[in-house]
């Protein structure tokens, strides 16, 4: 079974245009403080100009006050909320009382990764396992030891939720990840050239992941 694709960190009209014509299942927008941070006004303006061909839209936050998440989601056509910080079970349960959307939780790979997944059993609709980089929450271009991917996938299967793998995935190394059979692949910097989403790199990723070099939306 082919993994789902999520292209995260879209931060310009040109990024959205490149991702919209791709075969991605999800497009991500970062509302946390980072070099890829966007505003909801920017995102809605871009989406007014681009047909994303049915792709689902993910709003990413890091330890954001719940009121602020509610405010953003009310203004934009988002399908998923991704919590990418240290949000715990109580936080996510409170968030879900306020917003009727699926919530994904990032797990930053460490010796406690599986324990963190188990602590969130039953309250999230997917996990995103990312590299842990001191002082940063994601989009670093750093990967983690993929030999442990099967352990995360096994825990996701036990909980009956998909597990996306993120962190440092690019056209040059994605083939090393594929044998582990991830449910989804989450890419940000790996499809960028000079800070912008690259249609050429997107094509390279999709040819390797989906086995098809025709660059059309699936």
From Swiss-Prot:
What pathway annotation does it carry?
A: Amino-acid biosynthesis; L-tryptophan biosynthesis; L-tryptophan from chorismate: step 3/5
Q: Which reaction does it catalyse?
A: N-(5-phospho-beta-D-ribosyl)anthranilate = 1-(2-carboxyphenylamino)-1-deoxy-D-ribulose 5-phosphate
Q: Which InterPro entries match?
A: Aldolase_TIM, PRAI_dom, RibuloseP-bd_barrel, TrpF_fam
Q: Does the keyword NAD apply?
A: no
- Example of a GO biological process term: L-tryptophan biosynthetic process
Signal peptide (from-to): none
Q: Kindly list the GO molecular function terms attached to this UniProt entry.
A: phosphoribosylanthranilate isomerase activity
Enzymatic class: isomerase
Source species, domain of life: Bacteria
What are the UniProt keywords, alphabetically? Amino-acid biosynthesis, Aromatic amino acid biosynthesis, Isomerase, Tryptophan biosynthesis
Does the keyword field hold Transferase? no
- Family designation: Belongs to the TrpF family.
Query: Per its record, how is this protein called by name?
Result: N-(5'-phosphoribosyl)anthranilate isomerase
Source organism per entry reads Halalkalibacterium halodurans (strain ATCC BAA-125 / DSM 18197 / FERM 7344 / JCM 9153 / C-125)
Highest lineage ranks of the organism?
Bacteria, Bacillati, Bacillota, Bacilli, Bacillales
